Curated annotation (Swiss-Prot):
Family classification: Belongs to the RaCI family.
Gene Ontology terms: cellular component: extracellular region
Keyword Nucleus: no
Superkingdom as given in the UniProt entry: Eukaryota
Span list, region Disordered: 79-98
Protein name from the UniProt record: Complement inhibitor RaCI1
Biased composition (Basic and acidic residues): 88-98
Subcellular location: Secreted
Predominant cellular place of this UniProt entry's protein: secreted
Cross-referenced CDD domains: C5_RaCI-like (cd22951)
Keywords: Complement system impairing toxin, Disulfide bond, Secreted, Signal, Toxin
GO function terms (MF aspect): toxin activity
Signal peptide (from-to): 1-20
Amino acid sequence: MNAMLVLFIASALFISEHNTEEVKTTPIPNHQCVNATCERKLDALGNAVITKCPQGCLCVVRGASNIVPANGTCFQLATTKPPMAPGDNKDNKEEESN
């Protein structure tokens, strides 16, 4: 009985080891928002404005919204496309070529 249990566990470990695949990850590219810092400060009219974040990036300031000036970090905005219906792909290509 013990030998059967050991054999079962050994075969399960063997199968598990050979069937697991190494997960391939895509490296995160260095984009314009990496290592970019932004700043929340007052403009000439006394309004809080965000500056120094490249276009396409979002400034995230850690702290209450009433704290001015404050520093933050720029993050790249995700771009997504809405799902297309099966026939939409052909129509979009025709519109782009016109």
